[in-house]
From Swiss-Prot:
This is Defensin D6. It is found in: Secreted, Cell wall. Its main location: secreted. It comes from the Eukaryota.
């Protein structure tokens, strides 16, 4: 989603946030 575009997606399909990984 929005955060995926901001932080880039990981192979797992989650987004990388400033505090780590979170579900998308």
């Amino acid at each position: 989603g929005i955060f995926s575009n901001m932080y880039x997606r990981t192979p797992a399909g989650y987004f990388r946030g400033p505090x780590g990984y979170x579900x998308n």
